[in-house]
Amino acid sequence: MKDTTVPLTLISLLADGEFHSGEQLGERLGMSRAAINKHIQTLRDWGVDVFTVPGKGYSLPEPIQLLDADRIHSQLDSGNVAVLPVIDSTNQYLLDRIGELRSGDACVAEYQQAGRGRRGRKWFSPFGANLYLSMYWRLEQGPAAAIGLSLVIGIVMAEVLRKLGADKVRVKWPNDLYLLDRKLAGILVELTGKTGDAAQIVIGAGINMAMRRVEEDVINQGWITLQEAGITLDRNMLAAKLIYKLRAALELFEQEGLSPYLSRWKKLDNFIDRPVKLIIGDKEIFGISRGIDTQGALLLEQDGVIKPWMGGEISLRSAE
């Protein structure tokens, strides 16, 4: 990965939303205006909108709040949280270090160069706009005990966001958060471990907070940001609250499985009792969503018969 020191220093100087001349920035960083312009282009490549106004210099459309390790740690009583300005993927960062991690260790990033979603899809991750968070957990009972884990993560994230004012956030089976029927956040659970061994789990989450411009071919479904819904949250506070609540939820999940979460899912289910379609490969199955069963499988009603559906290749969409 190329050195990102200069662009990161630039973004910290521009974060106040004021104009800064190329000359001033060059003096601060000990380089020419032409060199500054080159690094500004790197910021644009990261998805940052930088305005250039002749005679005034460079500015961001509005101030941005950068992630701060000290502020996050000050709200937690234990565990490690790495703050990574630029990374390929937060999940990959933890997967690469799995031998040195303790349950509950986490990382957050400003920008993911290769963020990924379910089924290997690319996850669009512009700099400083959203919250990208991953956490490690060792599940002693093994991989089979992880069934339903993405549902638990979704419930906890939705409950945290609702308490902070985003009270219309809901969950979508098996791994998304929805707001006003559009995707607000995605969850990716990756695990390694053989039957009989402990499961090494990395949980990743991306929450759309204030996404700026986006190419339509990058995101293949309707999406929304908290900002668009009129909700502004402190990213450092949100990261700390999510990490705290997820650690507690994973301990409970280890002891009691999915059962403490079933009624909580029902209250938050975006598609309960609504017409939906399941996409399995190139096949579409239509029915009425009736929630989840005790294993976390989706319950789909067709012609008065309710059947559970489970599997990594199933997508759920509204059929309304």
Curated annotation (Swiss-Prot):
Record-level GO cellular component terms: cytoplasm
One example of a Gene Ontology biological process annotation: regulation of DNA-templated transcription
Superkingdom: Bacteria
Keywords: ATP-binding, Biotin, DNA-binding, Ligase, Nucleotide-binding, Repressor, Transcription, Transcription regulation
All residue ranges annotated as the BPL/LPL catalytic domain in the record: 66-254
Principal EC category: ligase
DNA-binding span(s): 22-41
Binding site for biotin: S89, T90, N91, Q112, R116, G117, R118, K183
Molecular functions per Gene Ontology: ATP binding; biotin--[biotin carboxyl-carrier protein] ligase activity; DNA binding
The reaction(s) this protein catalyses: biotin + L-lysyl-[protein] + ATP = N(6)-biotinyl-L-lysyl-[protein] + AMP + diphosphate + H(+)
InterPro entries recorded: aa-tRNA-synth_II/BPL/LPL, Bifunct_BirA, Biotin_CoA_COase_ligase, Biotin_operon_repress_HTH, BPL_C, BPL_LPL_catalytic, HTH_11, Transcriptional_repressor_C
EC number: 6.3.4.15
Its job: Acts both as a biotin--[acetyl-CoA-carboxylase] ligase and a biotin-operon repressor. In the presence of ATP, BirA activates biotin to form the BirA-biotinyl-5'-adenylate (BirA-bio-5'-AMP or holoBirA) complex. HoloBirA can either transfer the biotinyl moiety to the biotin carboxyl carrier protein (BCCP) subunit of acetyl-CoA carboxylase, or bind to the biotin operator site and inhibit transcription of the operon.
HAMAP family: Bifunct_BirA (MF_00978)
Protein family membership: Belongs to the biotin--protein ligase family.
Protein name: Bifunctional ligase/repressor BirA
Organism: Salmonella typhimurium (strain LT2 / SGSC1412 / ATCC 700720)
